[in-house]
């Protein structure tokens, strides 16, 4: 299975609804590594996902809906070169 890397920007009502924790749980379930964090604009969550293409695709599909309480308006996905730099999936501080 081919490994891929995706850089996501998820916009809408995605902060204050447990989006990051929920994404971490979904990513771990599918064996995806990387990170997720809030952006300081108050309406964007950013994430980098690495893993098998089908697993990353499942996390991206989940991100289009998010957890209960979220209202996702847009998910921008930038495909990047796979680096294999992550050992796990983490929640990073807001930037």
From Swiss-Prot:
Task: Indicate whether Hydrolase appears among the record's keywords.
Answer: yes
**List of catalytic residues:** 20, 38
**What top-tier enzyme class does this entry carry?**
hydrolase
Alphabetically ordered keywords of this record: Hydrolase
Catalysed reactions, as listed in the record: an acyl phosphate + H2O = a carboxylate + phosphate + H(+)
In terms of Pfam families, this protein maps to: Acylphosphatase
Q: Where is each Acylphosphatase-like domain found?
A: 5-93
Q: What EC designation does it have? A: 3.6.1.7
Cite the Gene3D superfamilies for this sequence: 3.30.70.100
What InterPro entries is this protein classified in? Acylphosphatase, Acylphosphatase-like_dom, Acylphosphatase-like_dom_sf, Acylphosphatase_CS
Its family remark reads:
Belongs to the acylphosphatase family.
What is the protein's name according to its record?
Answer: Acylphosphatase
Q: Which organism is it from?
A: Pyrobaculum islandicum (strain DSM 4184 / JCM 9189 / GEO3)
Q: In the UniProt record, what gene is named as encoding this protein?
A: acyP
């Amino acid at each position: 299975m081919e490994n891929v890397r995706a850089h996501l920007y998820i916009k809408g009502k995605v902060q204050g609804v447990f989006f990051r924790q929920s994404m971490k749980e979904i990513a771990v379930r599918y064996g995806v590594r990387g990170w997720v964090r809030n952006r300081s604009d108050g309406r964007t969550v950013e994430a980098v996902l690495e893993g098998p293409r089908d697993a990353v695709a499942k996390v991206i599909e989940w991100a289009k809906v998010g957890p209960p309480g979220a209202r996702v308006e847009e998910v921008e996905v930038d495909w990047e070169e796979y680096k294999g730099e992550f050992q796990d999936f983490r929640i990073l501080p807001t930037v």
